[in-house]
């Protein structure tokens, strides 16, 4: 088998390699995308009692590739991404060569899809054997630093597997992305898997159009059991034998496959992060040669790539061991100077280092750490160029929140000011801001999350030329109204639940990191009930007049607030920021988050009237009736409020209500200002929410 930058599996030469690689201990990877996510349209109709009984069923990485053809497989170092690529390459080539062991049967072997289940299911793969090609970008760079193109042989492949993205210069990504796009354009039927750490892939630009991001799931109990069984030296190990119990302090570190596998073979088994990594260090040749400083130097000093690779190999090619030692070096003395250099030098990989430091921090003296972490926060007025230091300080402090009352510290007020500035100004990357949103929630988000923006009376173009349900395009007149700047968030909806006792199927209502996230898993009836409650509350408090009510918007109001005066053009998608898609402007499937986030993280996704998050994030309920047929509305355009579509009082639950805006699971063509969806009013999902309108009547559209 040819080795180096390029792996093309030739089974006449590679049986020994494949045996070492597989070692019969291969555990198929799962991703965080679930069957429930894929089947959400049918599940939205299920009762809340039934949904509470459903355990998430995760797709495998192979099935993610089967679904999307071009995928970004992201996850922390040590989670098995490289092993998956090699096994996939071996088994595809093995199927073509009629290998008795490494073939499609091996790569599609059954998996347990749930956290605790025991039912095995064969993985779904539809396209048979494909000619594979595995590219290791790091080795490619070592071979020729001036290389700006892939080897010509890659063009013969039907399945292209790319590893080593973590280790290339970010500037090199530009030509790598260009090569990938060219190969994709030459043959749209090609399959691609690009493996990378999440912190790196999330920040690399340009993005790859047409690629779907999937996150590798941490180990389930079923996977841990299989690893324990396969790594056991006991020949009499029986099914049903209990797994080794993971200590609470090690639970985060042992979510990673490589670390858990190593831990199961240790005797006695370490009970803390420190003892675990110290035991790992004993296996390394450099254990006696200043390992902490060597690891710190690995990350902070510019060195020849071959020298860096030599150090990496000497630590068993274990990136987490290197990170542990580098963090340990920082904590010895001069923490601020050392750690600041470490994370700023790392650029894309800094958050992986921060996560390691947080694991170590749990076992350290909280009082000492508090002053060290607070001192990371800059003084003075917030500035974009220093904001990363404030965010790191907030994230580290969050980890020791249970040991000390940090929120009473005077400097926390300054820290919160910086974190809010990151959120509101769109500083740093989207993924940094997602962390900032969580930390702002914990510190106490002092934005006015129930803020209303005023929409003046006027007329606008409603609809577009792209879909029949959005036509004909027409000019619609609207009365003045007010609408929520943000979707209704958890902290506001929880107040309603606490006062009324209404049932809410949500795991977020008591989560201190998600108070400023959109309230989700809500039916149309939930949204209406909330509005009725808030009407009475705000009238009593004098926030609205006695002749004003709170309600959900009509379709026309929602679209006007989202698009403003933007005119529809043929073949043009319309968003709050204008026409044409922009990366990182909103939370849709293209972002790859597969989750909500704090409201207001995307200042570019602000409508002309000041509304945020109207594209992506969550589908938003409207008052307008759709009809019984999910594909074709009973009430077509042009919009007419007098034709019965706003007569919700007598509508039955089989009559769908309109939903707008798309969600984190929607593609860019669905998360527009014009796309129309419909759902039964008893349906709900973790991507469904709403925002409020305040007006003097029940129908804001004028004739």
Label every model-predicted segment.
Residues 461, 508-513, 522-675, 702:
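Functional-site microenvironments in short loops/helix caps that host divalent-cation chemistry
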Residues 247, 251, 308-314, 319-449:
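Hydrophobic repeat-domain scaffold segments
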Residues 37-53, 143-153, 307-308, 462-480, ...:
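Short, polar loop/linker segments at the starts of domains and inter-domain junctions
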Residues 1-19, 426-427, 431, 435, ...:
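GGW-centered surface loops in extracellular recognition modules
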Residues 4-46:
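Charged, amphipathic alpha-helical linker segments immediately N-terminal to NTP-binding catalytic cores
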Residues 684-700:
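Short, structured beta-strand segments at or near domain termini in extracellular proteins/domains
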Residues 447-506, 515-535, 615-616, 692, ...:
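A short glycine-rich, aromatic-capped structural motif
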Residues 35-286, 293, 300-306, 316-321:
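P-loop NTPase signaling cores
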